Amino acid sequence: TNEKLFFGSGTQLSVL
């Protein structure tokens, strides 16, 4: 599943 990738993107957005 691409859940990991999606989660990573969400985290980066949150940090920004």
Curated annotation (Swiss-Prot):
The keyword Membrane applies. One of its GO terms (cellular component) is T cell receptor complex. Keywords: Adaptive immunity, Cell membrane, Immunity, Membrane, Receptor, T cell receptor. Its main location: membrane. GO terms for biological process: adaptive immune response. It is found in: Cell membrane. J region of the variable domain of T cell receptor (TR) beta chain that participates in the antigen recognition. Alpha-beta T cell receptors are antigen specific receptors which are essential to the immune response and are present on the cell surface of T lymphocytes. Recognize peptide-major histocompatibility (MH) (pMH) complexes that are displayed by antigen presenting cells (APC), a prerequisite for efficient T cell adaptive immunity against pathogens. Alpha-beta TR is a heterodimer composed of an alpha and beta chain; disulfide-linked. The alpha-beta TR is associated with the transmembrane signaling CD3 coreceptor proteins to form the TR-CD3 (TcR or TCR). The assembly of alpha-beta TR heterodimers with CD3 occurs in the endoplasmic reticulum where a single alpha-beta TR heterodimer associates with one CD3D-CD3E heterodimer, one CD3G-CD3E heterodimer and one CD247 homodimer forming a stable octameric structure. CD3D-CD3E and CD3G-CD3E heterodimers preferentially associate with TR alpha and TR beta chains, respectively. This is T cell receptor beta joining 1-4. It comes from Homo sapiens (Human). The gene is TRBJ1-4.
